[in-house]
Amino acid sequence: MSFGIFHRILWLFLCANTLIVYLVTGSISDAVVTTMVGSLLLQLTYFANVLFLLWRAHCARRARQTTGQFHGEEQPGDPRIAGTHGRTDGDPCFEDEDSR
């Protein structure tokens, strides 16, 4: 999930949560507290998801390197550039403004 989509869902959830808690309890302080707790839980979940994706990418890269060693293949490019192995073709991060 991209950050933009997450950000919209976060704000939708927080506004709906605040409104519902206020309508049910009639207390602004309860609405603020539950909104802050919900915000914290959603942010922790997003952070855990990012860590999981990094771990999964690391495992996949390690598996590719291991199979390449068994077959005598070399990894192309610079492995210090994450995800590209040194190749910038097709990567939207390296596209020029004119090529879009």
Swiss-Prot record:
Topology within the bilayer: Multi-pass membrane protein
Renumbered residue ranges of the record's region Disordered: 66-100
Compartments where found: Cell membrane
Domain of life (superkingdom): Bacteria
Keywords recorded for this protein, A-Z: Cell membrane, Membrane, Nodulation, Plasmid, Transmembrane, Transmembrane helix
InterPro entries: SyrA
Transmembrane intervals: 9-29, 35-55
One Pfam family matching this protein: SyrA
Keyword Membrane listed: yes
GO CC terms of this entry: plasma membrane
UniProt keyword annotation of Transmembrane helix present: yes
General function of this protein: Could be involved in the inhibition of exopolysaccharide synthesis (EPS) and nodulation ability (nod).
Family in the record: To Rhizobium exopolysaccharide production repressor protein (ExoX).
Protein name: Putative exopolysaccharide production repressor protein y4xQ
Species per Swiss-Prot/TrEMBL record: Sinorhizobium fredii (strain NBRC 101917 / NGR234)
Organism ancestry: Bacteria, Pseudomonadati, Pseudomonadota, Alphaproteobacteria, Hyphomicrobiales
